[in-house]
UniProtKB/Swiss-Prot annotation:
Residues that bind Cu cation B: 309, 313, 347
Keyword hit for Secreted: yes
One Pfam match: Hemocyanin_C
Binding site for Cu cation A: 183, 187, 213
Functional note: Hemocyanins are copper-containing oxygen carriers occurring freely dissolved in the hemolymph of many mollusks and arthropods.
Disulphides: 82-87
PROSITE patterns to which the protein is assigned, alphabetical: HEMOCYANIN_1, HEMOCYANIN_2, TYROSINASE_2
The name this protein goes by in its record: Hemocyanin B chain
Note: The B chain contains two copper-binding sites. Three histidine residues are ligands to each copper ion.
Amino acid sequence: DASGATLAKRQQVVNHLLEHIYDHTHFTDLKNIAGTFSPEAATSIYTDDMEELRDGRLLEQHHWFSLFNTRQRMLFEVLIHCKSWECFLDNAAYFRERMNEGEFVYAIYVAVIHSGIGHGIVIPPIYEVTPHIFTNSEVINKAYSAKMTQTPGRFNMDFTGTKKNKEQRVAYFGEDIGMNIHHVTWHMDFPFWWKDSYGYHLDRKGELFFWVHHQLTARFDSERISNWIDVVDEIHWSCIEGFAPHTSYKYGGEFPARPDNVHFEDVDGVARVRDSRIRDALAHGYLLDNSGNKSSVYSPNVQYYGAIHNTAHIMIGRQGDHKFDMPPGVMEHFETATRDPSFFRLHKYMDNIFKEHKDSLPPYTKNDIAVPGVVIDSVAQLKTFFDTFEVNLGNAKVADVAISADVHRINHEEFSYNIDISNTDKIFICPVKDDNGIMDKFYKSIDPGTNHIVRKSVDSSVTVPDRQYALDLHMFERSCGIPNRDMIIIESRPDGMDFALFVTVDDPEEIGATHSQHGIKKYPDKKPMGYPVDRSIPDNRVFLESPNIKRTYVKVFHDEHGGEQH
């Protein structure tokens, strides 16, 4: 219930709560609430009866935070159970001054996303709330120097590593701030720890997990091909590639680096056991519950099957010797995980498990794919380049000095699909010999006869535009997706790279509207994620001879000097 507070007021309060999060608030209204509010006056909303607060066991401020620790997600439990805006505001203001900053930011973001109280509120881009996580240590040090001398500055930020490391050729992909935001926002929309008791069921969360991360690995493989690198192999519990993030926690030191060829003691054996249990379930077609009986997908025996994905993130993030008391690595934070090459190795491993299930399903027949009466007549026929993106570093320091960083990123010229047909369209692109990724999905009603459709790249439903600066936040719809300006097509090469472009048309009565992979409402597409290319295609004729599917070839060029596009 947000009664008594306008959307503009709630938006302003959330902005103020997240401003200079590592310092005490300077807003009088929040100060007054934090000094006078008593959580003990509303004990019914605290699931643990405030034991952590009473015993002085709140995670301390100026310390690193990990969402994989159940105790460090407890503030969300408080905020999600607030029944009124006043209750939400009182608790947020109170705990902002007393609780760990990382835990507070995470709780605010996820609560605003999932609570009715947060409806309509646009959360500031998290890279401006905690900029040190998204920029390298050199830039942050320059920002502090500028702050100390009260000298405005705009600093250039390079990708990590050197040319001696072949993974550096594709660092622009995993280290892209838009990619980092996409990944962390998706995990906020679909938390792995979500319970239906919070208010609703997250529809098709597991399948969405597969599809979203499959898209990331498919795009990453395509980027590697365009840079003359082999596609990524699945992880085998020796991390072949090392990684040095060159990034610091606000408090707690540098993110730890990992050398090449790190072997995990005992992990390989445990992983093989858990892996074999999951693959055995795939072969039998069912899971087991805690009593050893057949289970629904919502109540498997977690102790038996394990949590491979989450455990792997923790293991890779904490690979150092515990006697050195190092903070978690980048893999333990969804904001930074995609920077580490092992992230894509892990998700290729996860993807292969899902593919094993998909390959066990019967292939689609021509009757499954075809839409009677619909024919795609033609698809008319891209140069990529690097540009810079300005990141505001205002929350990285204390004094009000204009400080920002320029980050290099891949970009492309705006383009359009010209299609003669009808109905719900899906558009896929892949290198001629490897991997596919969805570029767009949209709904279009058609009239009898020929329909000419022009679809602009900026309208793609699987991408989002750049986020607004926190200072410019007024009315901007929150959403998550891969960055429109750089990730919808592949970097390619200066001499060009051939891609196959597929357009498919589906029956809207069977599909539904287009929301793509994000949102907290019921997923509107009833077909499997990635349909019709999600299963094996033993006979290409079934696929290519369907009148509602059209394949064409495009050539993508990369302009090393930037600017012009083909």
